[in-house]
Amino acid sequence: EASSEGVPVMAVSLETKAEDIMATSSESVGFGKATEATKLWIGRVLEEVYEKKNEAYRFLNINIPAGDIDVKGYRMTFVENQNYYVLRRPPERDWSKPYCLSFSIDVDEEKLHRGSDIQTVCQDRLISVTPITMDMTRNTLSRF
């Protein structure tokens, strides 16, 4: 919604273990470097979009490796064509009660493409910054 109103957008994710994905506590997941990196990118996005008129920075997907990383170390990336999360088959259960789907993180590292978002985070341990566009059809339509 923000993007459709002309407001710059950042989707920021921190690499975590599957069992910690729903954690909101900094005790189980270290949010310190992710917070630092997010602050840095907020400033960069505002400067690029509003001062330099660089539209490529209007909508970014930012993925941050876990651990003690250099928050200034990043790569502009593209979306990898394999899944990072794999849903697990749910057990038999009472369908009248809420259930949280479980998943595993399953990356085929040998099939990763150099410069992709997953490869950059998982192998090179750099922040992945992927420009996203809301207009995903303009270029494709010209091929029909």
Please identify what each model-predicted range represents.
Residues 29, 46-144:
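C-terminal accessory domains and tails appended to enzymatic cores
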Residues 3-26, 30:
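Glycine-rich phosphate/pyrophosphate-binding loops
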Residues 3-10, 44-54:
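Secondary-structure boundary elements
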Residues 22-23, 29-48:
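Short acidic/Ser/Thr-enriched loop-to-helix initiation segments
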